[in-house]
Amino acid sequence: DKLKELPVWKNTLVIFVSDHGYPYPKDVVNYEPRRYHIPMLWIGGAVKEPVVIDKLANQTDLAATLLNQLGIDHDTFTFSRNILSPDYPEYAFYTYSNGFGFIDSTGISVYDNEGNKPLIEAPRKGSDLRLRKGKALLQTLYDDLGNR
């Protein structure tokens, strides 16, 4: 509330987003999608009106979304997407120590790279496509990292 009283409040944006440094809740295993379901909160005088955006997204999408709102080019953020764009491809992707998860409007698929098998396919229908997308994205990430 004290920040709201300052003259800079009208141009201030504060973004809260969680990190994954601590396993919480404790009963959740590392690969479960609910471990990676985190909120992002934008507050401040720069936010013109309250709105809830209920979309699948990644933490990496913060860069493109914020920079686009500021009118700044975000093309160098290869894996970031503007979640406010009308043509935003809605999906979430996460990695854990030995695999990945891919979530879209058709469902959730989690893959174990060491065991070379799916751990979660909900629903089973559509899982093959989700897993192919997840594998392609993971390979693209590794290729990008290897080229840096």
Residue ranges and their predicted role:
Residues 1-148:
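Solvent-exposed soluble domains appended to multi-pass membrane proteins
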